[in-house]
Structures are given as structure tokens and as C-alpha cells.
Amino acid sequence: MRASSPRGFRVHHGHAGIRGSHADLAVIASDVPAAVGAVFTRSRFAAPSVLLSRDAVADGIARGVVVLSGNANAGTGPRGYEDAAEVRHLVAGIVDCDERDVLIASTGPVGERYPMSRVRAHLRAVRGPLPGADFDGAAAAVLGTAGARPTIRRARCGDATLIGVAKGPGTGPAEQDDRSTLAFFCTDAQVSPVVLDDIFRRVADRAFHGLGFGADASTGDTAAVLANGLAGRVDLVAFEQVLGALALDLVRDVVRDSGCGGALVTVRVTGAHDTEQAGRVGRAVVDAPSLRAAVHGPAPDWAPVAAVAGGHGDEGPGRSPGRITIRVGGREVFPAPRDRARPDAVTAYPHGGEVTVHIDLGVPGRAPGAFTVHGCDLLAGYPRLGAGRAV
């Protein structure tokens, strides 16, 4: 059966005058209280939306989420916090629930408050119950860019449906000066709040913590899942697998749509002491200028990439350095092949395609640590992303 939309969810999306003339506000709500799991930015400069949403998920139950695209409302002091709280209060009135059961997320330039007169007028004109579940419209509003392809994925797990919408760094409004990552999943599967939170944290660690776009965390990074249980129980192992695959698909989508140009770069690190070490190495390599030089250089040199991998291994006391090998497209490129006359494997990848780099750290003994990071090769478009005001 084709996945459509999970039962018991309603959606509103529209233009609230936040920025531009396109849809820039979305509300996703469950007809009944839903279990919720969420992860947020690790930045100490978290936006008010993150602070309020952390409070909302503390009891493991939520009714909905509101997303404002085009304004991060971060670095705006007490008044910015009050604005975000008012938005949450207005949405709670529409959904007919306690305001602490509403998550809020924002994305866009930092240092500006919401245009509250316009946002307030828009929300006061919305009447509950909300209409049908137009998740494609919600995805477009979350993205907040006219004419862009919404990032949305659907899947099935037994009788339950899962749906996810997302935006990544550089896929948002304000001329791509936005570094936030937002992702929201809804399902009608029945999963307890504690179990759902555990599952989602593992999924987020594998998917969103494997999203390589620089070391700096955004002020508003938010990923959440709501499960309202209307489809009944599901096999939890299968559910985690389906949710994990859905999240990884979204990560790859937002990387491709990031606006930085070039190829999707997937770095798979194996042979590490543990998953933490593998993830640390993978993220460092994806962000390294040496990787981009190797991908695009006329005479690719993978030794600097190996140096980055080795330098972030952090062997520690009692840990022995391994023998690092690097393969691109299945061909070993480090240590350097003897036949340098042969074209490097990476030249087989067209621009806009996908480059897969496999780094084995070669830690002696049993080394089960492995992690995969997705990023892009950051061509000329990327400096424009960092030149804006949003983070």
C-alpha cells in the first residue's frame, strides 16, 4: 500500500508576512495527544523557540508544532522570548490545547524579532479545527523559499504511516543566509513517550549528527517526532529501522538541496575504536578544505585528507595508531597507488553527482566503530551561505 499521510494529523500553512511573499508559517497538529521525542541544537546561543520547545517536550506529550520561516528570532533578548511565547499561545488556541503542548521552531536571519503585528494577525484569522493534512504545503512553508522543491518523505511500517519534512543549511529563505536544520516527523504508530524518545535519539545520532556543514551549531536546530497512536502498535525494531531510513533519506535530500553546489559527499569511517571516534573523524573530513581539493584538484592528493582523519582520531592513553586507508568509489587512493598515470577514481564522478569516500582507520584488534557523514563538496556557492546573518 502506498504511504499517504498518518491518521489524525491536521495542517495549516500560509503567508504570515515574515519575509517575502511566499508561505512562511506552518502548523502541524494531532487530533489527540501524541508521544513526542525531540533533539535540539547544542549551541549555548539557542533561540527562544528552542528554549520553549525543550519545555514542551519535557513530559513526553505534545499536540503540535508551529514553524516560522524567514526569521530565527535569535539574539533578540527577553522581548524575542515573549514574542515566541505569544506565537505558541496563539497556536495553542487554534489547536485547543495547553500551550506547553506546542513546539515552536524558527529559521532565518539572526538578530531580528518576529514581525509580530503580521504574525499575530495571521494566526488570529486561523480557525480550528485545521483542514486536511497537506504536508506538502507544510513542507514548502518550512522551506520558506518560493519555487523550491519541498523536502518531504513518506514510509509505511505495518498499518502505520510515517511522514517527514525537513530543511537544511542554505535551503531556507533570505537569499540562502540560513544555517538551520529543521526536521519534523509525524506517525500514527502507537509508541510510548519513553520508548519513542530513546528511538528518536538513536535515529538523530545516526542521521542528523551525520550532517556535515561546518562545526558551528545553529541557533535553532530542531528535530522532533510525534506519534499519536491511531494506527495501533507496531513492531518497534521495524519502526526504528523505517524511521531511521526516512531520516537518512531526508538528510541526503537537504544536502543535495543545500544551495552550496557540487556533489553530495558521503564519508564512511570504519575501523575506529568506537562510534564517537568514527563520527568525529567523519565530520572533520567532510568539513576539511583538503577533501575539496582532493575532489576537484587536477592532481588529487589524499595524504592531507588522511592527515585530517589521523589528527582527529584522538587516540588517547593506551590507544595505538592504525594504518589509515582511503578508498573512493571502491578504489584505494591512500596510500597513493603506484600507477599515478591512471586517472584518479574521483574524476569519474560528475559535478552534482555523488562522491563516496571510505576511510578505514585501521585501529589494531577489534575495532567496531563506524559512522557515516553526509555533506557537500562546498563549491563557490558556499561562501555566500556564510556571508549572511543567520547561523
UniProtKB/Swiss-Prot annotation:
Cellular-component GO terms for this entry: cytoplasm
Transmembrane segments: none
Main location group: cytoplasm
Keyword terms of this UniProt record: Acyltransferase, Amino-acid biosynthesis, Arginine biosynthesis, Autocatalytic cleavage, Cytoplasm, Multifunctional enzyme, Transferase
Subcellular location(s) of the protein: Cytoplasm
Record-annotated site: Involved in the stabilization of negative charge on the oxyanion by the formation of the oxyanion hole: T107, G108
Principal EC category: transferase
Biological process according to GO: L-arginine biosynthetic process; ornithine biosynthetic process
Pathway: Amino-acid biosynthesis; L-arginine biosynthesis; L-ornithine and N-acetyl-L-glutamate from L-glutamate and N(2)-acetyl-L-ornithine (cyclic): step 1/1; Amino-acid biosynthesis; L-arginine biosynthesis; N(2)-acetyl-L-ornithine from L-glutamate: step 1/4
Coiled coil: none
Active site, per annotation: S180
Residue sites binding substrate per the record: K167, S180
Reaction(s) this enzyme catalyzes, per UniProt: N(2)-acetyl-L-ornithine + L-glutamate = N-acetyl-L-glutamate + L-ornithine; L-glutamate + acetyl-CoA = N-acetyl-L-glutamate + CoA + H(+)
Pfam families linked: ArgJ
EC number(s) on file: 2.3.1.35, 2.3.1.1
GO molecular function: glutamate N-acetyltransferase activity; L-glutamate N-acetyltransferase activity
PANTHER family: ARGININE BIOSYNTHESIS BIFUNCTIONAL PROTEIN ARGJ, ARGININE BIOSYNTHESIS BIFUNCTIONAL PROTEIN ARGJ, MITOCHONDRIAL
Known role: Catalyzes two activities which are involved in the cyclic version of arginine biosynthesis: the synthesis of N-acetylglutamate from glutamate and acetyl-CoA as the acetyl donor, and of ornithine by transacetylation between N(2)-acetylornithine and glutamate.
Protein family per UniProt: Belongs to the ArgJ family.
Subunit annotation: Heterotetramer of two alpha and two beta chains.
Protein name: Arginine biosynthesis bifunctional protein ArgJ 2
Gene that this polypeptide is encoded by: argJ2
